[in-house]
Amino acid sequence: MRKDAQTNAAISILDEFLDGKNLNSILSNWTKNNRYAGSSDRESIRNIVFDILRVKKTFTSVLEKEKQPINGRALVFLYSVFYALNLNDIFTGQEYGPEKLTIFEKEFSKISKENIKECFGVVIIFLIF
């Protein structure tokens, strides 16, 4: 799977989780329904999901502050910005990837490193240690 397809899978898993479904069931069903995904793909997707869930409260407060919806895409976007991932490789708009960046996402991704630290605050300390 390409990185954008892995990201799109993580987005759909997070959306189901935010709808109140059990995470273990979601992951199990996703694995059964996507047999083409290799073990490294499944591991990458799980890592994205669990990394985001560890800091969900902080990411949620950033989204609320910016008056943005709280959904899988928004959480994955913040994760990608926080880890300085190449957003154009992730939000490709191609067949299996998430749609291209919105205007808000493009503007938000331009913030400086200092602003990222200010926005994310405590999460930086959490992830460093």
Where are each of the predicted segments found?
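Class I Rossmann-like S-adenosyl-L-methionine
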Residues: 1-129
